[in-house]
Amino acid sequence: MGIKSIVINEQQIEEGCQKAVNWCNAKFNNKKVIVLGILKGCIPFLGKVISKFSFDLQLDFMAVASYHGSHVQKQPPKIVLDMSHDPKDKDILLIEDIVDSGRSIKLVIDLLKTRHAKSITLISLIEKIKPKAFDINIDFSCFKVKDNFLVGFGLDYDGFYRNLPYVGVFEPDNP
């Protein structure tokens, strides 16, 4: 499969997701929030946390394309699916699978700012430990990991491996 090693196992994912739920429930207590999942990678993470959120929410999605069938970001990211709710004067909770360079999520945050969102909060399953190309404030991350190419639990290589119940280091030359 090309998986060199597992860096976050199933039990760790469960624990990290519960910590994210606790943090969000405390932050958004008695608020109405648009939970904005960034497709496609957010699906497993969002699925684990959304049913445990205790605040009022509307669910929405955006899709940002940046890798285009490789593990190297070759082109500037672009919005390929926009959200359906109007973010104006709303609290937005962004759900992201991974923050790597910050390019893709910065595009989303900048767009939400131009649309006059009341507040923008970013939680991510994974944050890579490396300098970000852009100044991004990650309000909560479940895991901070070294700069490897990762797959599993929403993270993919050319659309594959998202369904793995863990996160692993991927090497294309390691079948």
Swiss-Prot record:
* Record flagged with keyword DNA damage: no
What residues make up the catalytic site?
A: 100
Bridged cysteine pairs (disulfide): none
List the GO cellular component terms: cytosol
Sites where the protein binds diphosphate: 40-41, 162
The organism's place on the tree of life at top rank: Bacteria
Cofactors = Mg(2+)
- What is its pathway? Purine metabolism; IMP biosynthesis via salvage pathway; IMP from hypoxanthine: step 1/1; Purine metabolism; GMP biosynthesis via salvage pathway; GMP from guanine: step 1/1
Q: Where does Mg(2+) bind?
A: 96-97
Q: Where does it localize?
A: Cytoplasm
User: Where, in this chain's numbering, is GMP bound?
Assistant: 128, 149-150, 156
Molecular-function GO term, any one: nucleotide binding
According to its UniProt record, which reaction does this protein catalyse? IMP + diphosphate = hypoxanthine + 5-phospho-alpha-D-ribose 1-diphosphate; GMP + diphosphate = guanine + 5-phospho-alpha-D-ribose 1-diphosphate
Q: Where is the signal peptide?
A: none
EC number of the protein: 2.4.2.8
Keyword Glycosyltransferase among record annotations? yes
Pfam families found in the cross-reference section = Pribosyltran
What role does it play?
A: Purine salvage pathway enzyme that catalyzes the transfer of the ribosyl-5-phosphate group from 5-phospho-alpha-D-ribose 1-diphosphate (PRPP) to the N9 position of the 6-oxopurines hypoxanthine and guanine to form the corresponding ribonucleotides IMP (inosine 5'-monophosphate) and GMP (guanosine 5'-monophosphate), with the release of PPi.
Stored NCBIfam families: HGPRTase
Please report which protein family the annotation says this sequence is part of. Answer: Belongs to the purine/pyrimidine phosphoribosyltransferase family.
Protein name per its UniProtKB record = Hypoxanthine-guanine phosphoribosyltransferase
State the organism of origin. Mycoplasma genitalium (strain ATCC 33530 / DSM 19775 / NCTC 10195 / G37)
Task: Give the gene symbol.
Answer: hpt
